């Protein structure tokens, strides 16, 4: 008997993988991984180098690529230490990288990192303008103030023109300064330029004041104009009135040119004035105010009385209030917070509003009172005097401002005579207006009563049995066309043509519908009543050969028919899908699958199915009987319909029936009981009626009348 311990260590010699319950180094409970050298050590000892590592066999796959090119061992070790990915080939790595790039590009722009780089220099367009003016400048007499003007960032400046009046000596000095500063143009500072501009402007204002104090008469003005005409040969002097009235046009021209030319002519008089054009970037309102203060009264164009009247009229008539959104104060409230889709008026006006703060939801519209809306809007920045414009803005034309319609002029009479006349007219209109006393149209009424077959029978009780439908009408004998035979023949001819054309159109429509069903493979129209087993097989063959079609649907059949279709689908290796509702509307849909293109159909089993049930009727359509069968079913009672009497409207039932003769057994029995012709049935004191109750035929209505 072997020991228990030997049995536990059974298979321990199989290698390092043998453990508790292990057998020959296999993976057991507690057994390790089976190594290639330990499992067969006892039976088949390994050949060659016994000290090689267990990975040497698996390294050949790492050392060889797809083209069987040797890769050194160091490179394989580096590759094994790299991040392990599921892709090993180069093309797969490229696809892996491109997929990550697509993920990166699909992210939103605001989630991407953005780097801001500080510029080395501050961009100043005035430097570029100055250099361009310097290159284009060819005259030496340009004033230094023209080139030394720069934009001030603290003020929103717009260019306009000003008049510089100074003496000839100052102009010469400015020319010298320009020559000196032309050498040191690169060393200028903005503060120095600003100070120099202010000094020039102060000198300009002083000169203007001196001119206004010295020249008070009109002669001085004319003298100045003469001096200006002398200077016009060198520089065109702009009109002062045009400068004041239309500053923006000259501003654009001055900016496009980027230079101003001013040349000075000397004069012996101390009061000689020479004009200089200076461009200063200032806002339009500041320019106008500066020009109004700097120019004296004599330089201002005299205003006509018409202009004064126009100004007074403009001041007297207030301007219309602008729409909401044209004022700065309108932007204190965010209009996108509120959206109105409808408005309704009543005791309390309401708005159909979508607003997060009012309704508590982002996408839901709720009816809210107008007072609540106004209170919310005023609290969030809308001014009270702009409230009406705001409400009209958010409604967006939902409220149509209708012009008041003029009230119709109503005539009010002093007496009640007109009211009495109107009452009489209403009373007369309710009565019958036919003049019964007159003899008009009396002959027509008499002729109608003579020709009418039904006499004075009411319209409800008249006979309309002669109104035969057109599809059942064959002749027009019921009409009074005895005298005119040609008219009756033409009507019959037209009726026959109508029936023939209608039958032909119906046949053409059915043929067209059948062709379309065949073209679109619609079995509901192709097989209106039933399907043959050969038709089902041909449909499967057409679906198998047609590459453009992937499925087809059969009409609703009985359970055995559906089972037959499933068996044929298995033979053609196609799948079956049950579609429609349970019952009459349930049908089968055949769909191709992968096996359809891999395997051939099982024609042996198909032939066995073809030898089975041949015809399968549709259960969603009623069976159509043939015309012969239909006539037999109606005339199965001994042709009672052919001999049945036909009655007209108002005929008395049994009026033309013959009297029961004395040979009748029933009459003989009554006579034996004491009945005499002309008397009622029964004993004395309890006899019945002498005449029978009349029964009239009623075809237009049902019921008893």
Swiss-Prot record:
One of its GO terms (cellular component) is cytoplasm. Its main location: cytoplasm. Residues 662-705 form the G-patch domain. Residues 1-11, 41-53, 624-635 have a biased composition (Basic residues). Residues 167-193, 240-260, 416-439 have a biased composition (Acidic residues). Residues 152-163, 209-222, 261-272 have a biased composition (Polar residues). Pfam families: G-patch. It is found in: Cytoplasm; Nucleus. Residues 194-203 have a biased composition (Basic and acidic residues). It comes from the Eukaryota. GO terms for molecular function: nucleic acid binding. Residues 530-594 form the R3H domain. The keyword Ion transport does not apply. GO terms for biological process: mRNA processing; RNA splicing. May be involved in splicing. Belongs to the SQS1 family. This is Protein SQS1. It comes from Candida albicans (strain SC5314 / ATCC MYA-2876). The lineage of its organism: Eukaryota, Fungi, Dikarya, Ascomycota, Saccharomycotina.
């Amino acid at each position: 008997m072997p020991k228990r311990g030997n049995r536990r260590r059974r298979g321990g010699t199989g290698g390092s993988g043998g453990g508790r319950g292990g057998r020959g180094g296999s993976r057991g409970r507690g057994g390790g991984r089976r190594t290639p050298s330990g499992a067969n050590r006892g039976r088949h000892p390994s050949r060659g180098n016994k000290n090689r590592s267990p990975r040497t066999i698996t390294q050949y796959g790492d050392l060889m690529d797809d083209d069987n090119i040797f890769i050194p061992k160091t490179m394989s070790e580096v590759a094994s230490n790299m991040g392990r990915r599921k892709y090993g080939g180069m093309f797969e790595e490229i696809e892996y990288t491109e997929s990550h790039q697509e993920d990166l590009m699909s992210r939103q722009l605001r989630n991407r990192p953005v780097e801001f780089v500080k510029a080395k220099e501050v961009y100043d367009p005035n430097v570029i303008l100055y250099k361009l003016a310097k290159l284009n400048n060819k005259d030496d007499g340009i004033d230094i103030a023209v080139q030394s003007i720069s934009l001030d960032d603290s003020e929103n400046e717009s260019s306009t023109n000003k008049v510089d009046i100074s003496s000839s000596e100052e102009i010469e000095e400015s020319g010298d300064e320009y020559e000196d500063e032309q050498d040191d143009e690169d060393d200028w500072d903005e503060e120095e330029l600003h100070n120099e501009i202010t000094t020039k402007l102060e000198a300009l204002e002083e000169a203007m004041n001196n001119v206004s104090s010295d020249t008070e008469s009109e002669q001085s003005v004319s003298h100045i104009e003469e001096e200006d005409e002398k200077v016009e040969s060198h520089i065109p002097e702009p009109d002062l009135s045009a400068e004041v009235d239309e500053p923006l046009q000259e501003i654009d021209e001055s900016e496009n040119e980027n230079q101003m030319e001013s040349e000075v002519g000397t004069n012996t008089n101390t009061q000689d004035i020479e004009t200089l054009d200076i461009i200063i970037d200032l806002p339009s309102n500041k320019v106008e105010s500066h020009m109004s203060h700097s120019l004296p009264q004599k330089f201002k164009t005299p205003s006509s009385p018409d202009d004064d009247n126009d100004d007074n009229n403009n001041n007297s008539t207030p301007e219309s209030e602008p729409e909401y959104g044209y004022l700065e104060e309108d932007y204190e409230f965010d209009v996108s917070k509120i959206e109105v889709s409808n408005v309704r008026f009543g005791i309390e006006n309401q708005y159909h509003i979508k607003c997060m703060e009012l309704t508590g939801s982002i996408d839901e519209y709720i009816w809210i009172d107008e007072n609540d809306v106004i209170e919310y809007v005023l609290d969030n920045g809308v001014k009270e005097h702009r409230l009406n414009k705001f409400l009209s803005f958010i409604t967006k034309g939902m409220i149509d401002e209708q012009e008041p319609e003029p009230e119709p002029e109503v005539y009010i009479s002093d007496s009640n005579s007109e009211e009495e006349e109107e009452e009489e007219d209403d009373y007369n209109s309710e009565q019958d207006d036919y003049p019964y006393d007159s003899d008009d149209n009396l002959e027509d009424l008499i002729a109608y009563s003579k020709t009418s077959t039904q006499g004075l029978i009411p319209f409800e009780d008249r006979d309309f049995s002669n109104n035969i439908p057109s599809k059942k009408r064959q002749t027009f004998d019921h009409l009074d066309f005895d005298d005119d035979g040609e008219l009756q023949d033409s009507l019959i001819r037209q009726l026959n043509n109508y029936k023939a054309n209608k039958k032909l159109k119906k046949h053409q429509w059915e043929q067209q519908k059948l062709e379309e069903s065949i073209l679109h493979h619609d079995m509901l129209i192709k097989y209106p009543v039933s399907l043959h087993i050969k038709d089902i097989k041909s449909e499967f063959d057409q679906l198998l050969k047609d590459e453009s079609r992937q499925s087809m649907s059969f009409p609703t059949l009985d359970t055995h028919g559906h089972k037959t279709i499933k068996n044929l689908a298995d033979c053609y290796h196609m799948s079956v899908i049950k579609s429609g509702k349970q019952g009459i509307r349930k049908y089968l849909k055949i769909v191709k699958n992968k096996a359809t293109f891999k395997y051939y159909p099982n024609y042996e089993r198909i032939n066995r199915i073809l030898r089975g049930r041949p015809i399968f009727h549709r259960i969603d359509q009623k069976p159509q009987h043939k015309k012969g069968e239909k006539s037999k079913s109606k005339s199965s009672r001994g042709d009672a319909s052919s001999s049945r009497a036909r009655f007209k409207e108002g005929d008395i039932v049994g009026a033309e029936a013959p009297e029961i003769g004395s040979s009748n057994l029933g009459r003989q029995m009554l006579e034996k009981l004491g009945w005499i012709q002309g008397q009622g049935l029964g004993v004395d004191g309890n006899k019945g009626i002498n005449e029978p109750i009349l029964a009239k035929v009623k075809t237009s209505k049902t019921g008893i009348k």
